[in-house]
Amino acid sequence: MFEETIKKQFELLDISNFNVDISHRLLFVCGGKVDVRAPIPPSFRDRLLTYTAKNASELHEHFILAETFKDYFKENAYPDLLVFEDDIASISSLIIIFLESPGSLVELGIFCNKSELFKKILIVASAEEVYGEDSFIYLGPLEYIKKKVSSSVVIYPWPDPEVLKYDNDFLDDLCVNIKEKLSSIPKTEQFSKDNSGHIALLITEIISLCAPIQLSEIESALNSLGINISTKIINRSIYLLQKVG
């Protein structure tokens, strides 16, 4: 009975009139190790997190760490890393990649082939590596991305992992670059049923309007809007939404 009511209500709506509110910023941050117990931050990413916690809370509160999703395979939410990366990129306002770990180089390789995402990617690279002789990273992916969207790559001298002191001016400048990058990203978008981030946010709205609601009823609501996706994809979206809060 409730499912029939849902169908009737959502059949009255036209998704071509939908706009997506993306003003709530989600900043996906991946890179080197983070260890709050370490006397010296083990990575540049860790230093940014420590710095923003004290000096730029307006950014810090929107950070989502890659480690948040380390159980994605245990939960059977995603079949592989590529599908997960597509979804997290779609729902994120900005993807910040510190090139300081094998995992971050994998991230770079994945996103380098998705030029439509360059506007929402910020790659933080080591000056020592970039300006090093015959730097493959600079001559290859970074140079390619910079030619497409120059604001997508920033370069800083890397902190010494064995020295506590580091010039906070670099961290402050990085925060400025993050804010400038965010300011260039619109706060609303035309809804697209091919955008997994838009689908996830639509599912949030359906749950909010119809709670308590079952998985099959969410699927019925989407079907009534002309969006035919499997319960597996709905489950993926719900997993992602739960993780980002």
PLM feature spans:
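Conserved catalytic or regulatory cores that recognize and/or transform ribose-phosphate-containing ligands
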Residues: 1-245
